[in-house]
Structure formats: C-alpha cells, structure tokens
From Swiss-Prot:
Keywords assigned: Chemotaxis, Cytoplasm, Hydrolase, Phosphoprotein
Name assigned to this protein: Protein-glutamate methylesterase/protein-glutamine glutaminase 1
PROSITE patterns on file: CHEB (PS50122), RESPONSE_REGULATORY (PS50110)
GO-annotated molecular function: phosphorelay response regulator activity; protein-glutamate methylesterase activity; protein-glutamine glutaminase activity
Organismal lineage: Bacteria, Pseudomonadati, Pseudomonadota, Gammaproteobacteria, Lysobacterales
Major location category of this protein: cytoplasm
Entries under Pfam families matching the protein: CheB_methylest (PF01339), Response_reg (PF00072)
GO biological process, one term: chemotaxis
C-alpha cells in the first residue's frame, strides 16, 4: 500500500494568532503538511518560489499588498489552488466573491470576534476544503467566455423545431458548490431575458447570499434575486434562497411558488441542493430541467435522480471544466445525469432541454 504525499500548505495571514491556529488545525491531519507561513503577500511571494506549496490559504485583507491584487497576480503568473480566509461581513462577502471570480477555489469564513477560538469551530471545514483545493483544477477557472444564446438559437435543434416554448410551463433547477459562484455566473450570463424561470441553490454562508444575488443580477439579462416565501416563480427570473435557508418550490394551480424552509441542514448543508431538487421533482416533474455544476461532496445527486425519475431531462457539468467534480461526479455515478456538458455549453443545453420538456 502506498501512502499519499501530504498536501503542502502555505498560510498567508497578517495575524500571528490566526497563522498559529491555522498551522495547529492543519498539522493535526496526517494528510497535510504546513510548509510555511507569511505575514503579507510580499513575503508570501518569496516563500511560494522557494517552498512550492500545493495549496495557499490567503487572508482577504492584507498589508503591503491588497489580497485581491496578490491573488490576481498569482493566478496569472503561477496558478495555485487558493482557499480564502474571509470575514462574515457584507464587505467581506463582496471581496470574497470577487476573489472567487479571480480564481480562488473556495473560502472559509472567519469569525467576527474571538477569531482564535472561533477558528477551532471551523477546523473540519478548513481541513476538508484545503484537501479538496489540492485536487482542484485551477485552470478550469480561466475559461473563454461562451457565446450568448437566445431562445430561438438553431445551433442545437431539438426534434427539428426551434427553441421556442411557453416559458410559463418550464422551470430550470440548478445546484452548485465549490467553484459554483463563477459557474453560475457563466450560465446566467448567457441566458436571455425571456428564458424559463431558474431556481438555484449554491452552498454559501448566510451573510453572503444577498451580495451573491446582486452580483449575479449584474451579469445576467435575467432578473436574479433572493426568493421570498410564497412569491410566484416567473419567466425571466432566477431565484436563490435567502441566507442560511432552504429553497423549495410548491405548486399553486397553474404556477409555482417559492417556499422558504428553515428546516435542519441536509447533507450537512443549508441551503441544500437535494431539498430544492426533490421539491422540483414532486411539483414540476417533466416540466423541469435539472443541472448540477461544479462542487464538493454529493449534495444534489439523489435529488437529480428523483427529477430524472419524474420525467425531467438532466445534465451535469463535465469534469474538465469543473473546479471540483464531486457533486456532478456523484450524480453521474448514480445514473442521474442524461448528459455531461462543458460549462460553456450548459446554458445552451438547458434552453434546448427546456424546449423539449413535456
């Protein structure tokens, strides 16, 4: 039996206390070796050259050089998986989402107070995300932009008919996790304003959901918003669960409505993709289309299978374009995905499959 080489980690944080805590947390795992730490990006730059780490943990707010500037330079000159350590504030959410757009693989939220003691509560998450990052494909984040698609595009004909349909009868459900903030942006960026309604679940801390919805809305012709309980689901609109709550759909006569669910975590997540997908399977059946994008773990796989069994067309993002092929891979292995699609074709295929949904 061969032992796996430990993941080599460099910790970059201006707080000596945080550097010490992260070192202790990561060093407890036999699969991780902390090869060094740095108090600012300029020191980190030299240590990266010398130590060649597999993963870097990076504080967002740093002295001497802005963390985002450092990250952008790193991804351009020496692409390395990065896990951001960010604060649970509105400003922290915006900065972290920007970091993810620049190429960071994932992030861990830093407690607002008593950081040293608070980080211990995130120990399991920190370790799992660092290990996941070591396997992530950073190059998948630097992809060419897909052409914008429209409902009457003929590049992917379905049964010889144009991609036109009554959008009030169709619903698209999407789930994502690690790498998903950018993957969802790419998909929504290439959806036309008159696309079918989209309901989405992305694993995020509660305090990040508003900033994420606003960010997606700036990049899409669709109207992207946090869902409110009981609101009608309309064509041309995309809905995310509000912070730290599940999103489900319910049937109300000839339309669907959002149901905000404050129930317990599912698959250790809240919001959970499975909660959304199972409600879509039960209430929309063959009138829906399901998709799982990049993400760690297996949340959504069983729900996507239920959607397929209910008559909905399904797809997952392919491994080559995924930052982490955990959730899509789990769904594929379960037999829940009818198609495996590169990210730059997901929007096109969702529209095509919606056109043929019964």
């Amino acid at each position: 039996m061969t032992l796996e080489t430990p993941v080599r980690v460099l910790i970059v944080d201006d707080s000596a206390v945080v550097r010490q805590m992260l070192t202790e947390i990561l060093s407890r795992d036999a699969g991780i070796e902390v090869v060094g730490s740095a108090a600012d990006p300029l020191l980190a730059r030299e240590k990266i050259k010398r130590l060649n780490p597999d993963v870097i943990t990076l504080d967002v707010e740093m002295p001497r050089m802005d963390g985002l500037v450092f990250l952008e330079n790193l991804m351009r000159l020496r692409p390395t998986p990065v896990v951001m350590i960010s604060s649970l504030t509105e400003r922290g959410a915006d900065t972290t989402l920007q970091a993810l757009s620049l190429g960071a693989v994932d992030f861990v939220s830093k407690p607002k107070i008593d950081v040293a003691r608070g980080l211990e509560g995130y120990a399991e998450e920190i370790v799992s995300k660092v290990k996941m990052a070591a396997k992530a494909k950073v190059s998948a984040l630097n992809r060419p932009s897909a052409p914008k698609v429209t409902l009457d595009m003929q590049s992917a004909p379905v049964a010889g008919s144009a991609l036109r349909f009554r959008t009030t009868d169709r619903l698209i459900a999407i789930g994502a996790s690690a790498g998903g903030t950018e993957a969802l942006r790419v998909v929504l960026e290439h959806m036309p304003a008159d696309a079918p309604a989209v309901v989405m679940t992305q694993h995020l801390p509660a305090s990040f959901s508003t900033a994420f919805a606003e960010r997606l809305n700036r990049h899409s012709a669709m109207s992207v918003r946090e869902a409110t309980d009981g609101e009608a689901i309309l064509p041309g609109h995309a809905y995310l669960p509000p912070g730290g709550q599940h999103l489900r759909i319910i049937r109300d006569g000839a339309r669907w409505r959002c149901r905000i669910d404050d129930g317990p975590p599912v698959n250790r997540h809240k919001p959970a993709v499975d909660v959304l997908f199972r409600s879509v399977a039960a209430n929309a059946g063959p009138n829906a289309v399901g998709a799982i994008l990049t993400g760690m773990g297996d949340d959504g796989a069983r729900g996507l299978l239920e959607m397929l069994q209910a008559g909905a067309p399904t797809l997952v993002q392919d491994e080559a374009s995924s930052v982490v092929w955990g959730m899509p891979g789990a769904a594929y292995k379960l037999g829940a995905a009818q198609e495996v699609v590169p990210l730059d074709r997901v929007a096109e295929r969702l529209l095509a499959l919606s056109a043929q949904a019964r």
